[in-house]
Amino acid sequence: MRVLHVCSELYPLLKTGGLADVLGALPFAQKEIGIDTRILLPAYPKISAGIENTHVVTEFDNFAGHVVLRYGEYNGVGIYLIDAPHLYWREGNPYHDTDYNDYADNYKRFALLGWVGAELATGLDSWWRAEVVHAHDWHAGLAAAYLFNKGRPAKSVFTIHNLAYQGQFAHHHLHEIGLPEGMFHVNGLELFGQISYLKAGLYYSDMVTAVSPTYAKEITTPDFAYGLQGLLTGLREAGKLVGILNGVDQEIWHPSCDAYIQHHYKLKSIAGKKKNKADLQAYFNLPQQPDALLFVMVTRLTEQKGLDLLIATADEIVKQGGQLAILGSGAKHLEEGICQLAQRYPENIAVKIGYDEALSHLMVAGGDVILVPSRFEPCGLTQLYGLQYGTLPLVRATGGLADTVTNSTSETIEASTATGFVFQKAEADDLRSAIQHAFALWQKQRVWARIRNNAMAQDFSWKNAAAQYEQLYLGILNQ
């Protein structure tokens, strides 16, 4: 089975969000179970620097100008690079300039990505032809539309990592990207009078996946559908929209071999966790108190991530003698809000604005509770890291958070299924109650240890997702 992943990011070479983590793991897990998997990416500077010794597959001119298609390998997986410097040779973020303005030619940059994805199913590389084109998020959404326009020479899958980003462009660009006017209608590319690259992926693909079962349900409701409720509901009712949970790359995120932490540990040998906690407290200049319940949060500082809820309830952590360490950057008013808390409670709350990969690993390893109070969360990875490291996730019941964390009630503790703390409403009072619940169980260290053991015993390795995608591919290939 030959599968081509079409995407715009790849961890660790280029990352702006969780999309990169998925593409840095899923294709490699699929290769391990025997799928002939390749990845198609724009040749951004960071991508090109990380994939050396490429050779030219072909050169061509199309609506996007002169393009060279290159091929190389990265960690054993074949990589196609679209070498078009006039479109992709821009340092930094792949989607916008340093002032956060989207690039004016994004419509063309990502149309080309989809176009090449479709052409690799029809002989652009005479040595390899994709049977399944698997496109990720709006950047790759047009791949399915180009396949449709060519008579569907291969099967197509589209994965929604975040429906909030839709890739909408003015109608007048249609003639510039090689698609016929007849595809611009409500049963096609059109959304609110514009071309929607995301809708193209939804409408023209043989199968659509979301990154968790709960998110696949949520996006059929008005609060989460962003104007696509009718289409998404229809897909779900037709059995063409399913949820497949993301996994954890255990070569990077596992407490027994994490390259970023000093003290390794595992389920049956937990002593290293306490040492990591001491290291983390020292890093943030928090009192070295092993008995203080240490909450950590590694996140973008946005309302979506529930930062405003935490700011409103952090006093509960202080009142109960706990500690809170936060790493992230984002909205200025939220950065200021948490920094003010740290100034007010220096013995209890510490903040680092920015992102630091090594520190994020230490926080997951050294914390007792990892906070993910998101308003919505398609899948979420931090709670999975928390489970893996025995840092109990405290999450809101949404998206992948609802699918992966089991609230610690007397029943679930008794049944050995409890793995963390879950609250229902995106309200400060609900979060406060969950924090109080965590403190109550922290007083019962034997119970806490049982919950931590349950959490660490969960299996969210990528081999599970790889096997589910294999079944999905086989299903559409046999249609």
Describe the predicted segments one by one.
Residues M1-Q479:
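Catalytic cores of nucleotide-sugar-dependent glycosyltransferases that transfer UDP/GDP/TDP-activated
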